[in-house]
A protein has these predicted regions:
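Small-residue-rich transmembrane alpha-helices that serve as helix-helix interface/gating elements
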Residues: 97-108
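Juxtamembrane loop-transmembrane helix junctions in multi-pass integral membrane proteins
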Residues: 1-7, 30-34, 56-66, 90-93
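A low-complexity, Ser/Thr/Gly/Pro-enriched, surface-exposed linker/loop concept
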Residues: 35-68, 108, 112-121
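Intrinsic N-terminal pre-sequences and regulatory tails
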Residues: 1-11, 116-133
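Hydrophobic alpha-helical membrane segments
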Residues: 68-83
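Membrane-helix boundary elements
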Residues: 16-36
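Membrane-helix boundary connector in multi-pass membrane proteins
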Residues: 81-98
Length: 133
């Protein structure tokens, strides 16, 4: 069931993107290149695909929200699994826990955020239920 409006999802994307980029220094694992690269690349990627998403805080509004949600699910699974994929799961919880927690949260948001809403409907587009009612 999708119950999270895009207006709440959109700001979280940018906040989490910045946190992922800063995570190596926040959680003090910047001396470990594997998790540092994964965190920075996925944080920058999240910001990049948020900029092209057709939602409230998208700049270019190219990608539909359904595509954004799918990317969230795939990226979240990759993020959660990355401590084992890149062999840094034994480096301590301060290194692997942020990847697991943020990855699980991304999967949750991808599965529960509405596929439509927000921007398009405030700009005069027809709401999907308006045609049916």
């Amino acid at each position: 069931m999708r119950f999270i409006p895009t207006r709440y999802h959109a700001p979280l994307d940018y906040i989490v993107g910045v946190v992922l980029i800063a995570a190596p220094w926040i959680f003090q694992f910047s001396d470990n290149s594997g998790p540092t690269v994964v965190s920075i690349v996925l944080g920058a990627g999240l910001i990049a695909y948020s900029l092209i998403t057709d939602y409230e805080l998208g700049v270019w509004k190219i990608a539909p929200m359904a595509v954004h949600n799918l990317i969230d699910i795939v990226a979240g699974a990759f993020l959660a699994a990355s401590p084992w994929i890149f062999d840094f799961a034994d480096d301590g919880a301060k290194v692997w826990a942020p990847f697991l927690v943020v990855g699980a949260a991304a999967i949750f948001l991808g599965l529960t955020t509405k596929q439509t809403g927000g921007y398009r409907y405030r700009k005069g587009g027809a709401h999907p239920t308006a045609a049916a009612g």
